[in-house]
């Protein structure tokens, strides 16, 4: 069974982990609606990408009307 030959110091462990930090995203403003969106992704608020509608937004459904 493999075991460590020597103890890894806190300093050495920290140096190894120094590159593991997550990088914060860089959101862009949607040119259509102004909401923040991820770069090179479809806007979640309006469904537009590169000045054209990619995902059609569904209208709100009134549940009371459909139940009758």
UniProtKB/Swiss-Prot annotation:
GO terms, biological process: translation
Keyword RNA-binding part of the UniProt annotation: no
Any Pfam family: Ribosomal_L32p
Keywords: Ribonucleoprotein, Ribosomal protein
Record GO terms (molecular function): structural constituent of ribosome
Region feature Disordered, mapped onto this chain: 1-25
Annotated signal peptide: none
GO CC term, one of those recorded: large ribosomal subunit
Similarity field: Belongs to the bacterial ribosomal protein bL32 family.
NCBIfam families: rpmF_bact (TIGR01031)
Designated name of the protein: Large ribosomal subunit protein bL32
Origin species: Dinoroseobacter shibae (strain DSM 16493 / NCIMB 14021 / DFL 12)
Gene (name only): rpmF
């Amino acid at each position: 069974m493999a075991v460590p030959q020597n103890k890894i110091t806190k300093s050495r462990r920290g140096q190894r982990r120094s590159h593991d930090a997550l990088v914060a995203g860089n959101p862009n403003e949607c040119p259509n609606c102004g909401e923040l969106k991820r770069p090179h992704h479809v806007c979640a608020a309006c469904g537009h990408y590169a000045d054209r509608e990619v995902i059609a937004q569904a209208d709100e459904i009134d549940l009371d009307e459909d139940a009758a």
